[in-house]
């Protein structure tokens, strides 16, 4: 029998989320919607960039969030994007619902506590716009999401509808 190390166990819940049938369904819809998109996309490269930036900021600022929680929130933060493209439903609202559905149906042994689920859903819901009284997890994901974008070298930057505050790299 192969022994699972502590390091390998560290991301098993992340794998359970990414391999979840509901996640795969909505992730594929995003990919379909963005096939010919010239602006920033919301696929795995972006999701993992957000995760890495958030984790670095978490360490630098001593926020104390768990690494796996950050990565799970990152892969879920744009999961509602196809609803924004197809039905004009803000992706953070649709995404929070989808995230909750996934988190509530993970197999035994891969579940999150209620507190962890609440933090992940707050990151998904609060990452899009800066607002007064942001919680640390919302601020972390707002900043990480914006910093993940390469506006400085983007060929479509002039046509982009992001305001100057959002174009942090500019």
Where are these regions (language model features)?
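Metal-dependent phosphohydrolase cores
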Residues: 1-170
């Amino acid at each position: 029998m192969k022994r699972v190390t502590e390091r390998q166990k560290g991301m098993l819940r992340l794998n359970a989320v990414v391999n979840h049938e509901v996640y795969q369904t909505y992730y594929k819809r995003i990919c379909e919607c963005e096939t010919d998109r010239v602006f920033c996309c919301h696929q795995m490269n972006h999701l993992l960039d957000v995760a890495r930036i958030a984790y670095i900021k978490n360490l630098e600022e001593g926020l104390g969030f768990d690494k796996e929680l950050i990565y799970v929130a990152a892969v879920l933060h744009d999961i509602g994007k196809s609803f924004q493209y197809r039905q004009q439903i803000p992706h953070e609202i649709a995404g929070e619902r989808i995230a909750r559905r996934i988190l509530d149906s993970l197999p035994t042994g891969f579940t999150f506590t209620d507190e962890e689920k609440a933090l992940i859903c707050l990151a998904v819901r609060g990452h899009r716009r800066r607002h007064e009284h942001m919680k640390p997890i919302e601020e972390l994901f707002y900043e990480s999401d914006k910093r993940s974008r390469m506006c400085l070298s983007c060929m479509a930057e002039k046509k982009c509808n992001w305001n100057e505050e959002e174009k942090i790299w500019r």
